[in-house]
């Protein structure tokens, strides 16, 4: 299984999740958000930025995360329409997954493109050690901004 992430840090420690809440977790829990493709990873970054192309951080890298196909995945309960406008709901579900620590990954829908799957990666799960990271430099196309 291959997942993708855009980050300035080539690690999967999830320390960002300790400092800042996300759609699927509250601050104080280590977590890594990843996408199933490089464009999906880019979309998830772009939605949070309001910058010109020349201001895109030069420290950002594309991380290719390779995992065995056999890693454990939790199952998200069925979501009702309007779920993306309910941060308390999504954070509660993500927090449960992270706190339970019974699986490495939780597939979640993208709020930007709900037919697209993203993943929460639990760095506290024992299988987290099986992840291999390759780092790629990249410069986003200026037409994206």
Curated annotation (Swiss-Prot):
GO terms for molecular function: nucleotidyltransferase activity. Its EC number is 2.4.2.-. It comes from the Bacteria. SMART domains: RES (SM00953). It holds the Pfam family RES. InterPro entries: RES_dom. Keywords: NAD, Nucleotidyltransferase, Toxin-antitoxin system, Transferase. Belongs to the MbcT/ParT/Res family. Toxic component of a type II toxin-antitoxin (TA) system. Expression in E.coli inhibits cell growth. In vivo it is probably neutralized by cognate antitoxin Xre; this has not been shown upon expression in E.coli. Probably depletes intracellular NAD(+). Homodimer. Forms a complex with cognate antitoxin Xre; the 2 toxin molecules dimerize and each contacts an Xre homodimer. Most Res-Xre contacts are between the antitoxin molecule closest to the toxin. This is Toxin Res. It comes from Pseudomonas putida (strain ATCC 47054 / DSM 6125 / CFBP 8728 / NCIMB 11950 / KT2440).
């Amino acid at each position: 299984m291959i997942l993708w992430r855009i980050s300035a840090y080539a690690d999967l420690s999830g320390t960002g999740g300790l400092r800042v809440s996300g759609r699927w977790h509250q601050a104080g829990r280590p977590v890594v958000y990843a996408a199933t493709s490089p464009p999906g990873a880019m979309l998830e970054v772009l939605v949070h930025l309001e910058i010109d192309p020349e201001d895109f951080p030069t420290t950002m890298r594309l991380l290719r995360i390779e995992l065995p196909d056999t890693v454990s995945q939790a199952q998200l309960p069925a979501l009702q329409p309007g779920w993306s406008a309910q941060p308390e709901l999504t954070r509660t579900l993500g927090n449960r997954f992270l706190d339970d620590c019974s699986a490495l990954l939780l597939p979640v829908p993208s709020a930007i493109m709900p037919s697209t799957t993203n993943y929460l990666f639990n760095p506290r799960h024992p299988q987290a050690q099986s992840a291999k990271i390759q780092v790629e430099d990249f410069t986003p196309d200026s037409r994206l901004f």
